[in-house]
Amino acid sequence: MLPSLALVPGEPAGIGPELCVRLAQRSRSDAHLIAYADPDTLHSAAKALCLSVRLLDPDQPARAPGDLPLHPIRQAVATRFGTPDPANAAAVIAGLRGAAGDCLSGKLQGIVTGPVHKAVINAGGIPYSGTTELLAEQAGCPVVMMLANAIVRVALVTTHLPLRAVADAITADTVARCLRITAAALQRDFGLEHPRIAVLGLNPHAGEDGHLGREELDIIIPVLEQLRGEGLQLIGPLPADTAFLPQKLAGFDTVVAMYHDQGLPVLKYSGFEQAVNITLGLPYPRVAVDHGTALELAGRGIADPSSLMAATALCARLAARG
């Protein structure tokens, strides 16, 4: 039996809806996709792309290109591609929460999400720092954000924080939690029995023996020693400026970075189009695109669907593993 996956386009004024319409043009044998979206927005996206889309009841299977089962999420106002409206923030959140709730109840087996515009949601009066954090709160469990492409996987100890707040967020608990969740997910979801995890230092040159900061000596190294005693294969702390050299990456299954812009620029440079965002630690797989809403491209039919295609294929594989 094929896994059922929610397909949540994200910001309706961005490229998410048209990417979902493009995805529906492809017959697939790995999953049953159900869009959690506004039907009028999907029809508008299809019209802008000169494509057809036939919206079905959620339980109906897609049998032909253009078929897309739909769990309708009604927006407050009509979509204008390229011009987001904070009045639709509640609909964006409703789509995410509705899909997550159906995963937690067992009705669905995973979620694929498109790009969300954080500022628009906050302007709509809904405090929101990211979908990863929202899904973790709803599931009541700690999670880790991992981004991956064909070349490298990068997991993050901290996610969407101002740079001045990062050092205070690097604690023994946050580092250990990230490493345990990452190791368990690599074993369970990716079939790596003994994953080798490279851990970056926080400071330049991984602290230079305390001369450029003490977080490595006081926090990171003691955590690594403790977790090595529990059987985890951890390498580091490594200087971030050389850890991503190809000859070094060949010896790692993933890299754990201390903060967002420490690890992700390298990943995106090495293969942005195929990169995906995976939430580790949830009781179901969630995979997202690794790009933004691209408002300047919305409705023009030129947005690249590669990341959404990769996210959907990976989510289907993870869901099939159970």
List each model region and its residues.
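Conserved hydrophobic/aromatic beta-strand scaffold that supports enzyme active sites
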Residues: L134, M145, V154-L156, R286
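Glycine/threonine-rich beta-strand-loop-alpha-helix active-site module
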Residues: A123-M145
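Ligand-binding beta-strand-loop-alpha-helix segment within the catalytic cores
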Residues: L147-R177
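Flexible glycine-/small-residue-enriched beta->alpha junction loops
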Residues: A76, C141-V144, A148-I151
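Contiguous, glycine/small-aliphatic-enriched amphipathic segments in soluble metabolic enzymes
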Residues: M1-T131, A172-M258, Q262-T293, A298-G322
